[in-house]
Amino acid sequence: MTRPQAILTDIEGTTSSISFVKDVLFPYARRAMPAYVREHGNHPQVRHWLNQVADEIGEDVPDDVLITTLQTWIDEDRKHTALKALQGLIWGDGYKIADFTAHMYADAALQLQAWHAAGIPLYVYSSGSVPAQKLFFAHSDAGDLSGLVSDWFDTEVGSKREAASYRRIAERIGVPASEILFLSDVIEELDAAKRTGIRTALLERREDYPTPRSADDVGSHQRVESFSQLVF
């Protein structure tokens, strides 16, 4: 593989384990949501996101109903921008009081640092809100890695399974699609990126995917089990 001009990476299942997100972050936000909404619901930023939830369900409803809706969305792993924003705010409090640190695979932390040192700009694209992404990297168990990242993208740029989202990102960072390498564990995301000409690599970590995906499903995406296998 030739050296890309930019690297775009997912987080969950790519730089970090799926289990940390599913077993630590999601339950934490679910437990904290009722108290957080009741305590901060009148804050303009929080109310903005709560209003988006109300608009989504199409009703003028009390906060208790919004809380129940948000908890249901967490259980369903709903990729709703308002949910992701509120989760990010809750996790921010958790990071600040050291309730947890964000999991980062050692190979990912080392390789991101090496690529940054080599002058390759790094970008993050995750369904989690941009503030949540920044907190994740700033409070990782490998230390503060947020300074390695040139820019961050979330679902406000579009769905991760739509090619148009990757076109927007390429335009934003000012690099030809063919010179961007996108790293993800989700084949549908890689398919969408590849349709724009972006290079792709599938992360298939044994911890997250004990049974390898079939060759037919993987298609033409390069398949690796760690960042250390990405050589250019």
Swiss-Prot record:
Pathway: Amino-acid biosynthesis; L-methionine biosynthesis via salvage pathway; L-methionine from S-methyl-5-thio-alpha-D-ribose 1-phosphate: step 3/6; Amino-acid biosynthesis; L-methionine biosynthesis via salvage pathway; L-methionine from S-methyl-5-thio-alpha-D-ribose 1-phosphate: step 4/6. Its EC number is 3.1.3.77. The keyword Transmembrane helix does not apply. Gene3D superfamilies: 1.10.720.60, HAD superfamily/HAD-like. CDD domains: HAD_EP. InterPro entries: Enolase-ppase_E1, HAD-like_sf, HAD-SF_hydro_IA, HAD_sf. It is an enzyme of class 3 (hydrolase). Keywords: Amino-acid biosynthesis, Hydrolase, Magnesium, Metal-binding, Methionine biosynthesis. GO terms for molecular function: 2,3-diketo-5-methylthiopentyl-1-phosphate enolase activity; 2-hydroxy-3-keto-5-methylthiopentenyl-1-phosphate phosphatase activity; acireductone synthase activity; magnesium ion binding. Binds 1 Mg(2+) ion per subunit. One of its GO terms (biological process) is L-methionine salvage from methylthioadenosine. It catalyses: 5-methylsulfanyl-2,3-dioxopentyl phosphate + H2O = 1,2-dihydroxy-5-(methylsulfanyl)pent-1-en-3-one + phosphate. Coiled coil: none annotated. Its cofactor is Mg(2+). Belongs to the HAD-like hydrolase superfamily. MasA/MtnC family. Monomer. Bifunctional enzyme that catalyzes the enolization of 2,3-diketo-5-methylthiopentyl-1-phosphate (DK-MTP-1-P) into the intermediate 2-hydroxy-3-keto-5-methylthiopentenyl-1-phosphate (HK-MTPenyl-1-P), which is then dephosphorylated to form the acireductone 1,2-dihydroxy-3-keto-5-methylthiopentene (DHK-MTPene). This is Enolase-phosphatase E1. The gene is mtnC.
